[in-house]
């Protein structure tokens, strides 16, 4: 059959040259569009390491003025007074939420971009017995607020329990790190517990003397994903002693009980947001944790995650638009090319060829053209990358990436395979539908039409 395929391709070389050139261009463009999307989707679908599917973020806003602006007052007394009032009201909101039947735990968020799966805060930690440091995502949480229970972050065997880590009686001098970070620094997760860690920062005593800030590793937890756009399981959790006072807004993260429908919970609570209020604050929205960066600005700066998601969605929409048009063009070209072969189909039917054999022959010719064009595209793209005109989509993660994304040969093969399958499916559609129509035509009618 291969001999017949090559013979047919050569006999129609004038048309096939244009088909081949079109396929090379389409494969090349598809490669550039699919690569970043495939990488981002891969990272987004990596295990979160905590109960992300049961988390909801509640956004609380100031609806009645709470005192005067703190910047209009000198000294710390007024700020302390307002902070205490703010803390009381946040605890009232937390209690309102805990009274809901669907809610298991509630904790506070100080900054939306500093938490698992949406982290943008990094701190360089010096490595023991080394001159270099590593950049680690940091998360600041409020002690005595059920942080680890709410997120469902699990301690490793031998580490203090979730409740003990959330209480963290040692305050800001204690640190909780993930298993992979502990193994990177100390070689073993279990060996990290109780060790001291130099933060790389110093503090002064007011006389010009500087002292290093030393943390004690209070506990080690299982790996959690710090971000959704790169491989990142290193993470450090640093306790704060109190809520950060904000004059206009606050956020609480809610962990639902097992079996609760999150979509229904969000819809139901959205209709009764005005009922969940303290003296000056009211909860005005509920958003699934995974969607929080897209729907809320951060406390102190524009939400980088929201911008990242916007850019990604824009690139996906652009890629889909171009790929659909390119694929429709390929389908149309092969469709017309196949319909022109009605006479050839009639002759083969007259000589005893079956419908299945004719369709298989046409399809095999398309597969050969697609395979050759993909092979040429791979050579062109390798040179495209080698010359510096383009590059593989490999995020510059602070942590070594063990996945296929950072393995350049494997990365290239996987993306090439995805592109090849998409183009193969497109070509198959452009051949199978018209070929099915022409093989059902009787040989006499097929020859009469020609």
Model-based region annotation:
Residues 13-38, 307-343, 368-380, 425, ...:
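Hydrophobic alpha-helical transmembrane segments of multi-pass inner-membrane transport and secretion
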Residues 34-134, 388-402, 408:
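Membrane-proximal extracellular/periplasmic loop immediately following the first transmembrane helix
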Residues 3-7, 328-366, 440-450:
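Intracellular coupling helices
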Residues 343-389, 418, 422, 426:
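Transmembrane alpha-helical interface segments in multi-pass membrane proteins
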Residues 269-312, 402-404:
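A cross-kingdom feature of multi-pass membrane systems that activates on extracytoplasmic/periplasmic
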Residues 133-235:
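Hydrophobic secondary-structure segments that place a key small or acidic residue at a functional site
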Residues 2-8, 40-43, 414-450:
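C-terminal membrane-exit region of the final transmembrane helix in multipass inner-membrane proteins
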Residues 86-88, 142, 201-284:
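Small-residue transmembrane helix packing/gating motifs
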């Amino acid at each position: 059959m291969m001999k017949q395929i090559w013979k047919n391709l050569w006999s129609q070389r004038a048309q096939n040259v244009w088909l081949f050139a079109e396929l090379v261009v389409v494969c090349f463009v598809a490669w550039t569009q699919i690569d970043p999307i495939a990488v981002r989707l891969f990272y987004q679908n990596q295990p979160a390491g905590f109960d992300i599917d049961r988390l909801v973020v509640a956004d609380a806003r100031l609806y009645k003025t709470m005192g005067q602006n703190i910047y209009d007052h000198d000294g710390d007394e007024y700020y302390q007074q307002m902070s205490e009032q703010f803390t009381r009201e946040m605890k009232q909101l937390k209690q309102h939420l805990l009274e809901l039947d669907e809610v298991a735990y509630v904790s506070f968020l100080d900054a939306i971009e500093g938490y698992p799966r949406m982290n943008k805060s990094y701190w360089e930690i010096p490595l023991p017995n080394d001159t270099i440091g590593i950049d680690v995502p940091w998360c600041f949480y409020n002690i005595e607020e059920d942080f680890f229970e709410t997120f469902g972050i699990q301690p490793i065997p031998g580490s203090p329990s979730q409740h003990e880590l959330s209480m963290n009686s040692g305050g800001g001098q204690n640190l909780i790190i993930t298993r992979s970070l502990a193994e990177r620094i100390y070689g073993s997760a279990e060996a990290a517990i109780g060790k001291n860690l130099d933060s790389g920062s110093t503090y002064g005593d007011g006389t010009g003397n500087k002292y290093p800030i030393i943390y004690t590793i209070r506990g080690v937890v299982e790996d959690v994903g710090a971000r959704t756009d790169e491989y990142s399981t290193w993470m450090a959790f640093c306790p704060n002693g109190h809520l950060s006072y904000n004059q206009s807004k606050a956020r609480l993260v809610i962990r639902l009980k097992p079996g609760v429908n999150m979509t229904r919970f969000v819809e139901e609570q959205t209709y009764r947001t005005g009922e969940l209020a303290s003296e000056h604050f009211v909860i005005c929205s509920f958003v699934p944790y995974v969607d929080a960066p897209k729907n809320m600005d951060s406390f102190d700066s524009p939400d980088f995650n929201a911008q990242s998601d916007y850019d990604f969605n824009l690139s996906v929409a652009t890629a889909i638009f171009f790929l659909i048009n390119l694929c429709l063009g390929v389908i149309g070209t092969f469709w017309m090319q196949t319909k022109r072969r009605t006479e050839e189909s009639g002759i083969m039917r007259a000589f005893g060829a079956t419908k299945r054999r004719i369709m298989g022959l046409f399809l095999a010719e398309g597969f050969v053209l697609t395979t050759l064009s993909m092979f040429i595209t791979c050579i062109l793209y390798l040179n495209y990358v080698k010359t510096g005109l383009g590059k593989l989509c490999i995020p510059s993660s602070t942590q070594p990436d063990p996945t296929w994304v950072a393995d350049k040969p494997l990365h290239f093969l996987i993306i090439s395979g995805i592109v090849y399958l998409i183009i193969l499916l497109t070509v198959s559609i452009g051949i199978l539908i018209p070929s099915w129509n022409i093989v059902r035509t009787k040989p006499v009618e097929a020859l009469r039409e020609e």
